[in-house]
Amino acid sequence: MPMSLAADAAQPSSDTPMIRRRDAVVPGSWPDGTLPLLARLYASRGAGTPELALPKLGSLHAPELLTGIDDAVGLLIEAIANDKRILVVGDFDCDGATACAVGVRGLRMLGAQHVFHAVPNRMVHGYGLSPSLVEELAALQPDLLVTVDHGIACHAGVIAAKARGWQVLVTDHHLPGPQLPPADVIVDPNLDGDAFPSKSLAGVGVIFYVLMALRRHMREAGVFADGKGPDLTTLLDLVAVGTVADLVALDPNNRALVSAGLRRLRAGQGCVGLRALIEASGRDAARLTATDIGFALGPRLNAAGRLEDMALGIALLLTEDPRQAREIAQTLEQINSERRAVQQAMTDDAEQALTRVVLDMAGQRPVAACLFDADWHPGVVGLVASKMKDRLHRPVIAFAPAEPGADTLRGSARSIPGLHIRDALALVDARHPGLIERFGGHAMAAGLSMRLDHVDEFKAAFVAVVLEMLDPAALQQQVLSDGELAADELDHRHADALRLAGPWGQGFPEPLFDGHFEVVNWRVLKERHLKLELRLPGVPGTINAIHFGGWHGNAPSRHVHLAYRLACDDYRGGSAIQLIIEHCLPA
């Protein structure tokens, strides 16, 4: 039975989301034939012209703006010239796996003869470059260690690597702490004083930039017979997958990278492993979207790192054998099915615990929630924290034993707008030294570890910090809508255009509309979801809609105010549309 650790701190707030429409923005000049709806949506996201909405690779920020990039190139040039053994160390999430694959593939393309890779096992090594992982890596006899998507917080691991005489290049995108690891070179756009404009590069984006800088140096040195060198854009399928899956903001720089990667995937030019993964997931490669990456490809790759070993996912991304790729993709499909079952059971536990908390607090929601269960899996706590954060609209941390019966816990934190979760953990750490063993992350997500006997003290300290940092107004969930769709916009043409537009994601959200509908009929699917038939004046017949996870035992009102996404109904085919309901409120 899970225990809730934040039942003693509540603040009054409305549990009903507030749907608020975006301010109207007049779009700029668009080519003839552009749907007015699309132009309006782009403009409301700060991209009022085609150049801003659809950035090209030519608009990418220069690699030279990254602090340490020249020194990183120097390390790699020297390693390649002297046939040194280069070991790329990835991470056990999708960003870390794609970053590892990009690093290995890219360095080999640029002439490195001895490139190896490794990745920590979540259950065995924990996060990042740890001393125990360094001890195992010694068997590979590396000369140069290149971390991707981690390293900025791995002080002990870097010290252990340097003690063995290895050079260390850290490439990362996570926020640095007050003290940097003693690596030979660090490349991280979030270093203090770094001039790179896009602070939202994923780990895979950082290593891609290092490779671009390396190729430019080699071009200028006359290394390539054709004067150009290898085409690094062939790696953008991997860059796109890692960037979208890591939920970094899709600013113009990232949108240029993701758009180019999606074009390759849609054209069937992705690596063998990603093509097999798309097939295994049942997606149509020719119509692949960023949403497909986030909800189909990313979870399947992440499943390996959550329940098994991300070495399997990296093997998929590096293989050139279609048969092997299909076999690995099917294995990942099975692991992902297991992950879904584990996640559902843990989520059910968490929901029951939080229901008891709310009842104990006379219907008030806690200002923050910390959840722990001795039987939970550490690889899935992040998904549970995310689900509970969405349901409560509160910061949530979910903990599990690092391994069965262990006294060390691994936690995953998810936050809401208004609370920078990594800064909150940093403040707890500063006020209570030694309470948290390790932590790191971003504004909206973080990871941490601590001893089981420190949990109660941490709970009190964390809640105190949340009460101090979080404006009570932030506890009222704000749902930002793109407004109401006209009757003639509720059609397959507009739904299809929205699907293939974007790419949508963090910081450039997928369009969400709102409107008032009459519920003609409804039924429950799989004991969790609501399937509705709706009527809207001016629209002939009825409109299909589905609210995933929307069944909580109460029938919907006859008249409802919906926040929804417009989608094609792939099951009905033809010109059918379906509304994907995000919020259902009585009208």
Language model feature labels by segment:
Residues G74, E78-N82, P322-L371, G405-D407, ...:
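Mid-to-C-terminal polyanion-binding domains and interfaces
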Residues E135-V204, F208-A225:
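Active-site cavity-forming subdomains of large catalytic enzyme subunits
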Residues G90, V148, V170, P189, ...:
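Flexible glycine-/small-residue-rich
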Residues H173-H174, H377, H442, H529:
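Histidine-centered active-site/metal-ligand motif
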Residues A156-A160, A369, V384-K387, R493, ...:
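A short acidic, amphipathic alpha-helical/loop segment
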